[in-house]
Swiss-Prot record:
Record-given protein name: Lysine-specific demethylase 3A
Enzyme class (EC, first level): oxidoreductase
Keyword Magnesium: no
Pfam families per UniProt: JmjC, PWWP_KDM3B, Tudor_KDM3B
Name of the coding gene: Kdm3a
SMART domains recorded: JmjC (SM00558)
Tissue specificity field: Testis specific. Expressed only in male germ cells.
Cofactor: Fe(2+)
Chief place where the protein resides: cytoplasm
Function: Histone demethylase that specifically demethylates 'Lys-9' of histone H3, thereby playing a central role in histone code. Preferentially demethylates mono- and dimethylated H3 'Lys-9' residue, with a preference for dimethylated residue, while it has weak or no activity on trimethylated H3 'Lys-9'. Demethylation of Lys residue generates formaldehyde and succinate. Involved in hormone-dependent transcriptional activation, by participating in recruitment to androgen-receptor target genes, resulting in H3 'Lys-9' demethylation and transcriptional activation.
Residue span of region Disordered: 194-215, 271-293, 310-398
GO annotation (BP), single: positive regulation of gene expression
Domain of life (superkingdom): Eukaryota
Amino acid sequence: MYKSLLDKAGLGSITSVRFLGDQQSVFVSKDLLKPIQDVNSLRLSLTDNQTVSKEFQALIVKHLDESHLLQGDKNLVGSEVRIYSLDPSTQWFSATVVHGNPSSKTLQVNCEEIPALKIVDPALIHVEVVHDNFVTCGNSTRIGAVKRKSSENNGSSVSKQAKSCSEVSPSMCPVQSVPTTVCKEILLGCTAATPSSNRQQNTPQAANSPPNIGAKLPQGCHKQSLPEEISSCLNTKSEVLRTKPDVCKAGLLSSKSSQVGAGDLKILSEPKGSCIQPKTNTDQESRLESTPQPVTGLTKECLVTKTSSKAELDNATAPELQKRLEHTASTPDGLSDKPEVEAGVTRLNSCSEKKVGPSDLGSQSQNLKETSVKVDHDSCCTRSSNKTQTPPARKSVLTDPDKLKKLQQSGEAFVQDDSCVNIVAQLPKCRECRLDSLRKDKDQQKDSPVFCRFFHFRRLQFNKHGVLRVEGFLTPNKYDSEAIGLWLPLTKNVVGTDLDTAKYILANIGDHFCQMVISEKEAMSTIEPHRQVAWKRAVKGVREMCDVCDTTIFNLHWVCPRCGFGVCVDCYRLKRKNCQQGAAYKTFSWIRCVKSQIHEPENLMPTQIIPGKALYDVGDIVHSVRAKWGIKANCPCSNRQFKLFSKPALKEDLKQASLSGEKPSLGTMVQQSSPVLEPAAVCGEAPSKPASNVKPICPANTSPLNWLADLTSGNVNKENKEKQLTMPILKNEIKCLPPLPPLNKSSTVLHTFNSTILTPVSNNNSGFLRNLLNSSTGKTENGLKNTPKILDDIFASLVQNKTSSDLSKRPQGLTIKPSILGFDTPHYWLCDNRLLCLQDPNNKSNWNVFRECWKQGQPVMVSGVHHKLNTELWKPESFRKEFGEQEVDLVNCRTNEIITGATVGDFWDGFEDVPNRLKNEKEKEPMVLKLKDWPPGEDFRDMMPSRFDDLMANIPLPEYTRRDGKLNLASRLPNYFVRPDLGPKMYNAYGLITPEDRKYGTTNLHLDVSDAANVMVYVGIPKGQCEQEEEVLRTIQDGDSDELTIKRFIEGKEKPGALWHIYAAKDTEKIREFLKKVSEEQGQENPADHDPIHDQSWYLDRSLRKRLYQEYGVQGWAIVQFLGDVVFIPAGAPHQVHNLYSCIKVAEDFVSPEHVKHCFWLTQEFRHLSQTHTNHEDKLQVKNVIYHAVKDAVAMLKAVNPVWANVNSSAHWR
C-alpha cells in the first residue's frame, strides 16, 4: 500500500513511496487538500478527524525513523526494529539495535530468529522501528520527570485544569513539515541524553514524540501551531487554539514556538521566508485562568539584584563561572529595539514599583504573548489537587508590563520565577523543561513551574539590546528570612514534642547529626577557593535527588549550569577519582548534557541547599545545648582536634583572602556566626559540671547489678570509670577524616534510674543495664546461646532480692509487675526469654519497657490488637465487595511468577476456599498466591479511609508508630518537604501448608531501611484441605519455635497466621557472606550491583538456618504471629515470612531515634544497587529527617533553662 508523505515545502504536493511487499496504492489529489491549506481550517478539521490526526503523526514518526535508519544513527541503540524478509512464511522478523555506524550507515542488530544476522544496511533492505506508542523513548519507560517528586501533602490525585475555548484569526503563514536536521537535534539533545527513571510519579516521559509541524524560521519570528495531537495540539479535549506572539521588536522568542534548546538555534538562523503574525482577540487577552498552586512563597521583597551594585555582582559570581554561564543571543537586524509595554494587563501588587521580584514557589506563570506582553493563559498547568484550597497563583515578573519595562531599561538581574519553556527559547532549558516541551500525548500533563530545575535558582538579565540572557545563579548569602527560617531552630515552629523527648532524641541522634556536619565540611574543603558555590533554594513539594544514584540530596551537591543535571557528593567524588586514575565509572552512567555533550566533573557547579552558614550554626547550637543539659556527646566534634575544623566561610568571604595571596583552608577559617543566631558554644566544650555537694561513694569494682540494687536503699551515686569514647565512622561519609584518639578526660556524673533505663545506645560501654542485658550465661543443651536479657529477672532481683539461681527456676512467661519501679505493664517472654511480648496494646507504659529492648536491636511483639479493631472492616468479604473488579497482578509464591490480568475478586474468592483458587496451566493445581502491591503505592489512606482511621486509632505504641508520634522522627520533617512514604501497606497472601511448601517463603529474606510495625488483622483457615492443624503444627516446630509459642496454638486455641524469622541488624554482613557462599556452591553468579538480601531471592529453610548458626554463629528469633499480634521489626534487621494460613497483614513504617544509624548505613548500601532495584531510591530522606529532628530538639531545649534545684541529682542523658 502506498503511504503519502508530507514534503518540506508545505502541503502543496504529495509524494507516493512504495515499500517492499505492498501491492495497493492510494493517491490524494491537490484539490482535496485545498480546504486544509488554511492553517485555522486545518486545525478545526484535524481536531474533529482523529483518524487523519493519527495518520499525520504516524507519517512524521516514520519519516524521522527513516532518516535515523538511513544514517545509522547511534540514538537507535536499544530500539526494537522489524526487518523485511523475502521468506513468504515469515515476512517480518524482529531484532534489537545494539550499535549504529554513521560512517558506513549500517546497524548492528541482535536477532533471536536469525542469530547469524549481525549487520543490516537500511538502504538495501527495509527496516522499521517498532513503536508501542508515539511517546516512548526506545526501551526506556518513564513514570515521571527524572529528578523531582511532587508532595503528597496536596492529595494523591492530580488533575489538569480545564481550559477555556477561544477563537483565533486566520493565519497567513503556511504550515511546513519539520526538517529532519531539526528533529534530529531535538532528539539528540533530549532523547539520547536522557535515560529512563522511575523516580517521579506524576510526569510521564515522551522522548521519541514527534516535534511540532512548523517551518524553519528566522530568529525573532514565530510560527503558528497546529492543534494539539501532532504538536501537542491534536487533542480531543476542548482547549484554546493558541497563537504565538509577535516578538520581533522585543527580541524574545517564546519557547512554545520552538521545541529546540539554545544549542539548536544555529539550525534556525537562516530565514526561509517572512511570517505575518496574527492578532489574538482582546477577549482572550484579558481572560485570566484561576489555578490553584502550592503555598510556598518568597518574601514580599523580590529577589532582584540591581546592576548599580557592580561590586556585589562581581563578588557574587566568579569570572570563570560567569564566562561559562553567560549566553548572549545573537539577534538579526531590527530586533535590537527595546520592547514597548502596552497597558491593559492585570498588574501584580505583591512587589513594589522599585523592585521587581519572582512569584511564589509553585506559581502558575504565563507565557509572553506579544510585544505588549499578552499572556497565554492556557499554557499553565497545575500539579495541585482539587482537594486542596490554595490562594490564587502569583504571576511571573515577566508578565507584568511595567515591571518588565523597568527590568529591560535598568538591566537589573532577577531570579527566574517560571519554567524554562515559559520564558524564552534562546535560554538553555533544564532537563525537565526539555522533556516537557516534547510531550505530545494528550494524556500527558505539563509540569508545574516548580519542577523546573532553574526555578528560583537561575538569575536572568536583559542586555542593552533587550535580549534576555543568563546572569548567573543565586549565592548562599542571598537568602531572606523565610528561606533561612526553614533551617533554623525556632521554638515557634516546634509542635508535638516535650523536653524529655527532645533530650532523648538529641542524645540518640546528635552524634549522627555531627557526622553529617563534618561530612559537609570535608566535602566543602575539596572545592577550589576560586570557585563560586551556588545556592539552590528549597522548593515546596520538590525533592532534590541525585541523577546518578537516586539518593536524596541533603545539602552540598554539583549541578550542571546548562541543563540542571545534579549529582550528590559521593557520586561526584567517585567520578572525579576515576577520571583522575583513567578508570571507567561503571557503577552508574552519567546522563549527557544538551546535544549529547559529556558531563565532566570540572564543569559542574558546587551548589548548596541550606542557605548561608545555617548548617554550621545549628551544629554549634547542638554542642551548646548538650553541654547545657548534660547530654553526653560521643561525636568526633568532642575531640579537640576538630576545634579548628569550624564552619567554612562563604566563598564571597574568601575572595579577599585569595586576592591577598593567602590560601584559605578550613583549619584557618574564622568562625562567623549568622546574625539570626545567638552565639554558640565552641566544639569540644565540656558538659556542665555536677553539683558540688555530690560525692561518689561506690567502689570501682561495684557490679552493675549491685549498683542497681542500691537504688532501693537510696544509694544512687556512682562514679563513672574512664572510658574511651569512639564513634564508628559511617560508610562513605567521612573517609578522609583522621582516626579519633580516645578522650582522656574523665566525667564524674550522677545517674538516676529513670535516666539510665532510658539511656540511648552510644557504645559498647554505655550503661550498666545494657551490660547486664548483653551478658551471656553459656549455652543450652541444644548448643544455642541462652542470653537472659530479661527485665523481669533484673526487676525481681531488686524487689525480691532473688539470686540468679532462683531466677532460673521461675516459670517461663511469668508476668511480673514491678510497680515500685514505675512499670505496671503486662508482658511475658518468648523465644527462650529473648523476645518481649506486651499483652495490653493500649497500656500507657508500654513504651518504657519497649524502648529498653528496642534500643538493643531486638524485635518486640504486642498481642491482642484484634480485640480493638473493627473486625467487619478487615474481612475478605468486605474487600471483595468494595474492590472486586479492580485488575491486579498476582504472584505465585511457589515459583515467584507474576500472573497478570486477574482481578481482586479472583484472589479473594480463593482466600478461604481452596477449590475456588486459580489453577496453574500444567498440573491444574490450585496456586498459592499473594496480591502484588495492592493497594498500589501510597493509595491506602485515600482508597480505604475508614480502615486507615481504624488502624491508626488502635495501633500500639503510638509514640512511635503514628505519623505524628513524638518518637517517630519522620514527623519532624516539615510539610514543606516531600513526606516519605511510610505506609500503611497491605500484605495479603494464601497459606503454605503442605510439607513441600516449607522450603518456600511468602516473603523472602530482606530488610527495610525503616522500622516497621506489622499487624495481623485477619487469619483465614481455608476449607477443602485435610489435616491442616497437624501440618501447621509441624511447620511451627520445624521453624524452631519455642514451647510457649506451641502452647499458644495447642492450648490457647489461637489462630496462627505467619512464621517469622528475624535476625539482628549486626549479623547482616555474616548472612550476606553465607548466602554468597551457598550461591557459589550452587553455581550461581553474584553480580556486583546485586545483593542476596536486597534482591529477596532467598528463603532460609531449616537446613540453611542450621548451617548459618553452625558456620557463622548467627541465631535469629523464630516468631509465630497469631491473630491480633503486632510484630515490630527494627530497621536493617533481615527477616522473612512464611504464611501458615491465609493472612491479611498491614504494616506501618516509622523512624525511631534508636535505629537511625541503620538507616544511615542502608542508604549508602542502596546507592550501589542496580537502578532497576526496588530499594535503589532513597525514599526515606534520612539526612533531612535527622537534621529537622535535631533542629526541633535543640529549639525546644535552648529555650528552656534546666532547673537542677528541683531534683536531688542531675540526670545525665547519655
